[in-house]
Amino acid sequence: MNARAESLPTVASDLISLTKPRLSSLVLVTAAGGMWLAPGHMGAVNALVTLLATAGTVGAANALNCYWERHSDQFMDRTRNRPLPSGRMEPAVALWFGISLAAVSLPALALGANVLTAALGLVALLSYVLAYTPLKARTSAAMLVGGVPGALPPLMGWTAVTNQMDVGGFSLFAIMFLWQMPHFIAIALFRKEEYRAAGLTSVPLERGDESSRAQVVLYLVALIPMTLLPFQLHIAGAWYLAAAVLLGLSFLGLGAWGFFRRLGNTWARQTFFFSLIYLTGLFAALALDRVPRE
């Protein structure tokens, strides 16, 4: 009995780790940002239920992803100690945990927000688990497919308030979609050999480092004008515009430096970490300089 009681915290910790809390928290911030920026009002209880249900949906997708990738995770330093590849948890537990979490979270999204937001959550879940995850072992285009569920949370936050998809919500979706590309290419560059050992493909493995660095620059060139849309749509004000331009040019400068100097893993890690600073700064500026709604 005592041994069983002592194991409960470990089991709980392992279940939580399946949801990838750090990734889920980042997604939750973007969903909350979409809710804050959307025109209209939402009650505090409904907003809380919506955010918790969004977190549950993301956690379910991550848990099912862990189930699917339990074999390849054994070959990567950052994943081999997860509950499934390490052998601490039976695969069936992770599978049913993910399914159960989704079964609770998606109806909660419909109740807390609306059916449209729940439908977007379902699209995010299915595209992440059934499309992006299996494609990772086959083609680098999986990155583009995975960009869709990764970009849906701010749109879900927007539709939770407005109950409609419009250009404002899609501008947030586009920003998140384009931001993910240099972010994930950077990871794939400095973890290239781990990807190879795990049997996964990526832009660097398929196209080479030079093409990968070039794609980072091209995606940043596309991202910068997209970040100006919230100002043009009167979602955010001039201070946001200044922050978006400054952050965008800084990010582009870092990308161009790596491309022209043909830099390697150190630059890729710097690009990865700056991408997190960039996204945090951009959404902070959006939140702080939100144009008041009447």
UniProtKB/Swiss-Prot annotation:
<feature type="transmembrane region" description="Helical">
    <location>
        <begin position="141"/>
        <end position="161"/>
    </location>
</feature>
<feature type="transmembrane region" description="Helical">
    <location>
        <begin position="92"/>
        <end position="112"/>
    </location>
</feature>
<feature type="transmembrane region" description="Helical">
    <location>
        <begin position="240"/>
        <end position="260"/>
    </location>
</feature>
<feature type="transmembrane region" description="Helical">
    <location>
        <begin position="48"/>
        <end position="68"/>
    </location>
</feature>
<dbReference type="Pfam" id="PF01040">
    <property type="entry name" value="UbiA"/>
</dbReference>
<keyword id="KW-0472">Membrane</keyword>
<keyword id="KW-1003">Cell membrane</keyword>
<dbReference type="GO" id="GO:0008495">
    <property type="term" value="F:protoheme IX farnesyltransferase activity"/>
</dbReference>
<protein>
    <recommendedName>
        <fullName>Protoheme IX farnesyltransferase</fullName>
        <ecNumber>2.5.1.141</ecNumber>
    </recommendedName>
</protein>
<comment type="function">
    <text>Converts heme B (protoheme IX) to heme O by substitution of the vinyl group on carbon 2 of heme B porphyrin ring with a hydroxyethyl farnesyl side group.</text>
</comment>
<dbReference type="InterPro" id="IPR006369">
    <property type="entry name" value="Protohaem_IX_farnesylTrfase"/>
</dbReference>
<dbReference type="InterPro" id="IPR044878">
    <property type="entry name" value="UbiA_sf"/>
</dbReference>
<keyword id="KW-0812">Transmembrane</keyword>
<dbReference type="GO" id="GO:0005886">
    <property type="term" value="C:plasma membrane"/>
</dbReference>
<feature type="transmembrane region" description="Helical">
    <location>
        <begin position="25"/>
        <end position="45"/>
    </location>
</feature>
<keyword id="KW-0808">Transferase</keyword>
<dbReference type="InterPro" id="IPR000537">
    <property type="entry name" value="UbiA_prenyltransferase"/>
</dbReference>
<dbReference type="GO" id="GO:0048034">
    <property type="term" value="P:heme O biosynthetic process"/>
</dbReference>
<comment type="pathway">
    <text>Porphyrin-containing compound metabolism; heme O biosynthesis; heme O from protoheme: step 1/1.</text>
</comment>
<feature type="transmembrane region" description="Helical">
    <location>
        <begin position="272"/>
        <end position="292"/>
    </location>
</feature>
<keyword id="KW-1133">Transmembrane helix</keyword>
<feature type="transmembrane region" description="Helical">
    <location>
        <begin position="115"/>
        <end position="135"/>
    </location>
</feature>
<keyword id="KW-0350">Heme biosynthesis</keyword>
<keyword id="KW-0997">Cell inner membrane</keyword>
<comment type="similarity">
    <text>Belongs to the UbiA prenyltransferase family. Protoheme IX farnesyltransferase subfamily.</text>
</comment>
<feature type="transmembrane region" description="Helical">
    <location>
        <begin position="170"/>
        <end position="190"/>
    </location>
</feature>
<feature type="transmembrane region" description="Helical">
    <location>
        <begin position="216"/>
        <end position="236"/>
    </location>
</feature>
